[in-house]
Design a protein with these regions (language model features):
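Two-component/phosphorelay signaling modules centered on CheY-like receiver
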Residues: 13-32
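Acidic, metal-coordinating helix/loop segments flanking the phosphotransfer/catalytic sites
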Residues: 33-51
């Protein structure tokens, strides 16, 4: 089973640590964390990331704007937004910014895990998927 690199972006340290702890129980994930949109943007430029989980309310810029910047820079992997605001308008803004999914806090971990796996499966089947064989990336 391939290991998928997930970047978790949230300024709430306790939530970030709890999610990393839960996801680390599964051998299928390699986990990294960031506290801001700026850190996330730099991270996805420097490293291969298979999926980003990104909070909307980040200290340096709105998470949706961070996603927009990542997409403009060519980031193709799935992005799941986390938000405390569940309005339809908020969801539309996130999806239009380039997010693939929207999860409203509080959420059940099992639901987030199922969405992560579904987006990874879908992305692997798409033309945008990146494959590594030894030192080569395709």
């Amino acid at each position: 089973m391939p290991v998928h690199h997930i970047l978790l972006v949230d300024d709430d340290q306790s939530l970030r640590e709890a999610l990393i702890e839960q996801l680390a129980l599964y051998d299928e994930f390699k986990l990294s964390a960031a506290e801001s949109s700026g850190q996330a943007i730099q991270f996805v430029q420097d490293q291969r990331v298979d999926l980003v989980i990104m909070d909307v309310g980040l200290p340096d810029m709105d998470g949706r704007e961070g996603v927009r910047v990542m997409r403009k820079a060519g980031f193709k992997s799935p992005v799941i937004m986390l938000t405390g605001q569940g309005s339809d308008a908020d969801t539309v803004l996130g999806l239009e910014a380039g997010a693939n999914d929207y999860v409203v806090k509080p959420f059940k971990f099992a639901v987030l895990l199922a969405r992560i796996r579904a987006h990874l499966r879908q992305h692997e089947a798409s033309e945008d998927a990146v494959f590594q064989v030894g030192p080569y990336t395709f």
